[in-house]
C-alpha cells in the first residue's frame, strides 16, 4: 500500500485561527479523504509553531510565560480542527520535546557535513516577518527602513549567527525543479521560484541571540546564547512528527510521498529553504508543494485593525460545516486570491447544494417510492439510456482528473455538472408521463440511471463534503469505503437498489440583500431588532379575533396521495389528499413554483379542512394546504412526527 504525507504549515500562535487557516486545513483534509479512498495510507499532519520573538513579546504583554501563552493558543487551533471534524493523524507542537531533539540532531548532522558555519550578521530585522531584509530591497522612508514584504518598521541589528550554506544548493534546486515540472502547483508559482533562485542565493542565518524563546543548540556546540531560528525549527516539523532519527513505528515511510499545502506568503521558505535542508540531510524531496492564495473580505484584505477578520467556526455554526467547505473549495480557482461574502455563500448553498443536489435526491426518492416501492433494477439502463450513462461517466472521470492537479474548483464544478445533467434529464423524459403511458420498464431504467449516477458521484463528493456524501450513499444502502470506491466509482458497476428515505441533505438559506461591512450591524442583528420591536408593539384592536372565531377553524393532518400539474397554469397543482374520511379530497394549491408534483407524494401536510369549497381554474378545491413564505421561497408546514391522516390539530 502506498504511504503518503499531507501537511498544512504549522500555524504561528501569535493569534487565534481565522478563515485563512481553516481554508488551508480544509484543503489538506480534502486531499486526505481523496487519497485514502484511492487506497493510500495517508498521514495528515498539522500543528502549531510556538517559538520566536513575537511569541516572547506577546506573552510578556499578557504577563504569561511563552510556554503558557503558546499552550492556550495551540489548544484553540486544535479545538477548531476538531469542531470541523478534520481527520488529522498528527498535531505537532514545536515545543514538544521530541521535536526539540530532532532539530538539535539535524543541526549536528548539517554542521558536521559543513553545511552550517558560524559567522556574524548585520542587517535590518523585521520582527513581524522574523527575517532580515536586504538593505537594497528595504524601503528607506523618512529615516525609517521598512520591510519590503509587510511595510513595517525594521530594526538595524548586528549579531553573531550560524549560517546554512544555501548558496551551495542553487544548482541542485534548479535541477530538481527542471526534472519535476509539477513539483509546485500552480505551475506559475514554480516559475517564480526558479526565477528567484537564478538571481543567486545568499547563505541563510539560522540562529538568533537577540531573544531566548527558541530551541537551544546541541550541547556539544557549547554555545548556549544561540537559539535555532524559526525556519529551520518550523520546517523540520514535517520530519520530526514522523519520528525522523527516532522512527520506531516506520512513519518516515510516509515522507517519501509528501504533499505540502501552504499559502503564497510562505512559498519561498518551502520551495527553497526546505528542499535545501532535505538535500543536506539526504532525505527525499516532496512530491508536491501546493500553493494557495489569500482570502479578502468584501474586497478588503483581512486586518485586525479593520475588525474584518473572519472566524471560520462562527460562519460554520451559522451556515453549516459542509456548506462552508463547499464554498471555500468551489468559489476560487486554487492558487488565486478569493473574496468571501455571506451573500455569495448563500447563493452557492441555495443554487448548487439545495436545488441541484438536494432536490434531485428528494425527487428521486419520491418517484422511486411512488412508482416502484423503493426498489429499482438496473438491468434495462443500457437498453434505454446508454448514451446518457456514458455521458455521466465521462463527466465523473473528468471531475476526478482535476484533483491531483489541485484544480479543486474544477473538480467540484464538473461534479455538479452531473447533477445538472440529471435534473435536465428528468425534465426532458418527464417520468410522470412515462408512468401515465404505462412505460414502466423505461421509467425504471431512468430512475435507476439517476440512482446509480448519484451513488457513483458520492465517492468523489466525499473528499469535499464527507457527511453529505455519506448521507447520499446511505440513501442507496451503501457505505463509503475504499472497496466500494473501486467497485462503484472506478469500475462503474451498476447496482440494483432498494432506496431508503433520508433527511434532506441541505436547507435553503435566506438571501442577504446587503452584505455586512466591518463596524455595521449585521443583517441578522437588524432583523432581530425589527422582530423585537414588532413583538413589543401593541396589536391594533381590529387585528384581534376572539377564541370562538378561532375554534371555527378546523386544521387536520393530511397525507398527499397524488399530485399533478394543472394545464395552462404554472403555479397551481391538483392534489388528492387523505384526511381520514374514507375518500380523497381534491385541493388546488399554488405551490407549483416551489415543488415538483412527484416530490409531494407521501408527504404529511396541515390542511384547513372546513374551508368553503371554491373553484380555481375550473377545478373544485375542498380545503387549503398551510405553508409559510418569505421573500424568496415557500415551505409546506408539516407535523414533526408522523401522524394518522385526519388527526385534528389543536
UniProtKB/Swiss-Prot annotation:
Required cofactor names: Zn(2+)
Matches recorded under InterPro entries: Met-tRNA-synth_bsu_C (IPR004495), Met-tRNA_synth (IPR014758), Met-tRNA_synth_2 (IPR023457), Methionyl/Leucyl_tRNA_Synth (IPR015413), MetRS_core (IPR033911), NA-bd_OB-fold (IPR012340), Rossmann-like_a/b/a_fold (IPR014729), tRNA-bd_dom (IPR002547)
Any GO MF annotation of the entry: metal ion binding
Motif residue range(s): 'KMSKS' region: 301-305
Ranges where the record places region Disordered: 513-535
Binding positions for ATP per the UniProt entry: 304
Domain tRNA-binding: 549-650
Keywords recorded for this protein, A-Z: Aminoacyl-tRNA synthetase, ATP-binding, Cytoplasm, Ligase, Metal-binding, Nucleotide-binding, Protein biosynthesis, RNA-binding, tRNA-binding, Zinc
Chain positions recorded as Zn(2+) binding sites: 126, 129, 147, 150
Primary location: cytoplasm
Enzyme class: ligase
HAMAP family noted in UniProt: Met_tRNA_synth_type2
Function: Is required not only for elongation of protein synthesis but also for the initiation of all mRNA translation through initiator tRNA(fMet) aminoacylation.
Name used for this protein in its record: Methionine--tRNA ligase
Protein source organism: Helicobacter pylori (strain ATCC 700392 / 26695) (Campylobacter pylori)
Gene: metG
Amino acid at each position: 500500500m502506498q504511504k503518503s504525507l499531507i501537511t498544512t504549515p504549522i500555524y504561528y500562535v501569535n493569534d487565534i485561527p481565522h478563515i485563512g487557516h481553516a481554508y488551508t486545513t480544509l484543503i489538506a483534509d480534502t486531499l486526505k479523504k481523496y487519497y485514502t479512498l484511492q487506497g493510500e495510507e495517508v498521514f495528515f499532519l498539522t500543528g502549531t509553531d510556538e517559538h520566536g520573538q513575537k511569541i516572547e513579546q506577546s506573552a510578556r504583554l499578557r504577563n504569561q510565560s511563552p510556554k503558557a501563552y503558546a499552550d492556550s493558543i495551540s489548544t484553540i487551533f486544535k479545538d477548531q480542527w476538531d469542531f470541523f471534524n478534520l481527520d488529522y493523524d498528527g498535531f505537532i507542537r514545536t515545543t514538544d520535546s521530541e521535536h526539540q531533539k530532532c532539530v538539535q540532531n539535524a543541526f549536528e548532522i548539517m554542521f558536521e557535513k559543513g553545511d552550517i558555519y558560524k559567522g556574524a550578521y548585520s542587517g535590518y530585522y523585521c520582527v513581524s516577518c522574523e527575517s532580515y531584509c536586504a538593505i537594497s530591497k528595504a524601503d528607506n522612508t523618512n529615516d525609517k527602513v521598512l520591510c519590503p514584504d509587510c511595510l513595517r518598521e525594521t530594526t538595524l541589528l548586528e549579531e553573531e549567527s550560524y549560517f546554512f550554506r544555501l548558496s551551495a544548493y542553487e544548482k541542485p534546486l534548479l535541477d530538481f525543479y527542471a526534472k519535476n515540472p509539477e513539483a509546485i502547483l500552480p505551475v506559475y508559482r514554480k516559475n517564480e521560484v526558479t526565477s528567484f533562485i537564478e538571481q543567486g542565493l545568499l547563505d541563510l542565518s539560522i540562529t538568533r541571540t537577540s531573544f531566548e524563546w527558541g530551541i537551544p543548540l546541541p550541547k556539544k556546540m557549547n554555545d548556549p546564547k544561540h537559539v535555532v531560528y524559526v525556519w529551520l525549527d518550523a520546517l523540520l516539523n514535517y520530519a520530526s512528527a514522523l519520528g525522523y532519527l527516532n522512527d520506531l513505528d516506520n512513519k518516515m515511510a510516509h515522507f517519501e510521498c509528501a504533499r505540502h499545502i501552504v499559502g503564497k506568503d510562505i512559498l519561498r521558505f518551502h520551495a527553497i529553504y526546505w528542499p535545501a535542508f532535505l538535500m543536506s540531510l539526504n532525505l527525499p524531496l516532496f512530491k508536491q508543494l501546493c500553493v494557495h492564495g489569500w482570502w479578502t473580505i468584501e474586497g478588503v484584505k483581512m486586518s485586525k485593525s479593520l475588525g474584518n477578520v473572519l472566524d471560520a467556526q462562527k460562519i460554520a455554526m451559522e451556515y453549516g460545516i459542509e456548506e462552508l467547505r463547499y464554498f471555500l473549495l468551489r468559489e476560487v480557482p486554487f492558487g488565486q486570491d478569493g473574496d468571501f461574502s455571506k451573500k455569495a455563500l448563500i447563493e452557492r448553498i441555495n443554487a448548487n447544494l439545495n436545488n441541484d443536489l438536494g432536490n434531485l435526491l428528494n425527487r428521486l426518492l419520491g418517484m422511486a417510492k411512488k412508482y416502484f416501492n423503493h426498489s429499482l433494477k438496473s438491468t434495462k439502463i443500457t437498453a434505454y439510456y446508454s448514451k446518457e450513462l456514458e455521458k455521466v461517466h465521462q463527466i465523473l472521470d473528468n471531475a476526478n482528473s482535476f484533483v491531483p492537479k489541485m484544480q479543486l474548483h474544477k473538480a467540484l464544478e464538473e461534479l455538479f455538472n452531473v447533477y445538472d445533467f440529471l435534473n435536465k434529464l428528468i425534465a426532458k423524459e418527464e417520468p410522470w408521463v412515462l408512468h401515465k403511458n404505462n412505460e414502466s420498464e423505461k421509467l425504471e431504467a431512468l430512475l435507476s440511471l439517476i440512482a446509480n449516477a448519484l451513488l457513483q458521484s458520492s465517492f468523489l463528493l466525499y473528499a469535499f463534503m464527507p457527511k453529505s456524501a455519506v448521507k447520499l450513499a446511505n440513501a442507496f444502502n451503501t457505505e463509503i469505503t475504499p472497496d466500494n470506491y473501486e467497485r462503484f466509482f472506478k469500475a462503474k458497476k451498476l447496482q440494483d437498489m432498494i432506496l431508503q428515505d433520508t433527511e434532506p441533505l441541505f436547507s435553503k438559506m435566506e438571501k442577504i440583500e446587503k452584505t455586512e461591512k466591518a463596524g455595521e450591524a449585521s443583517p441578522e442583528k437588524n432583523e432581530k431588532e425589527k422582530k423585537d420591536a414588532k413583538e413589543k408593539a401593541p396589536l391594533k384592536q381590529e387585528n384581534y379575533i376572539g377564541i370562538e372565531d378561532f375554534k371555527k377553524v378546523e386544521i387536520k393532518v393530511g397525507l398527499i396521495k397524488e399530485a399533478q400539474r394543472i394545464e395552462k397554469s404554472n403555479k397551481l397543482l391538483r392534489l388528492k389528499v387523505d384526511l381520514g374520511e374514507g375518500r380523497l379530497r381534491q385541493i388546488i394549491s399554488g405551490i407549483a413554483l416551489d415543488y415538483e408534483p412527484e416530490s409531494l407524494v407521501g408527504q404529511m401536510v396541515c390542511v384547513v379542512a372546513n374551508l368553503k369549497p371554491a373553484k380555481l381554474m375550473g377545478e373544485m378545491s375542498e380545503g387549503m394546504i398551510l405553508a409559510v413564505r418569505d421573500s424568496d421561497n415557500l415551505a409546506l408546514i408539516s407535523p414533526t412526527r408522523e401522524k394518522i391522516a385526519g388527526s385534528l390539530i389543536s
